[in-house]
Design a protein with these regions (language model features):
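Eukaryotic acidic, Ser/Thr-rich intrinsically disordered low-complexity regions
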Residues: 90, 95-111
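Alpha-helical scaffold domains
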Residues: 1-4, 11-17, 44
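Conserved hydrophobic register position within alpha-solenoid helical repeats
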Residues: 7-10, 38, 69, 101
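Amphipathic alpha-helical scaffolding segments comprising HEAT/armadillo-like alpha-solenoid repeats
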Residues: 14-28, 47-59, 78-90, 111
Length: 111
């Protein structure tokens, strides 16, 4: 997909342009730095194309991924994600992730 530059710089450029669509597939990248940046980009650009994948990622084994996903879903403003975040929060054991999920649900009240 990317011929020039690294993935992180491409994500930053997409975020700057307000279009996360070109980097949606990077939310599943094996490099955690790339993955988290792509997840954050989805929220920053309100990329609805990533919503379903992000909802599924609320169950990711990595706590940082789950926390970033909650924030991204809130940034996207997908009100349908609120129930999924609430369900994930009800069983979440990591305090940092649970806090991110609670903040995400509060932010989604504004949509």
């Amino acid at each position: 997909m990317f011929i020039f530059g690294n993935k992180a710089s491409k994500i930053a450029k997409c975020a700057q342009k307000g279009n996360g669509n070109p980097v949606v597939k990077l939310i599943k990248d094996p490099d955690m730095t790339v993955r988290l940046a792509a997840i954050d980009c989805m929220g920053a650009t309100r990329c609805h194309a990533a919503s379903n994948d992000l909802i599924n990622m609320l169950q990711d084994p990595n706590a940082d991924v789950r926390a970033h996903v909650a924030g991204a879903l809130a940034g996207i403003g997908d009100v349908h994600a609120k129930a999924h975040i609430a369900n994930a929060a009800s069983v979440e054991k990591d305090a940092k992730v649970k806090e991110a999920m609670v903040k995400a649900m509060a932010k989604l009240k504004d949509f």
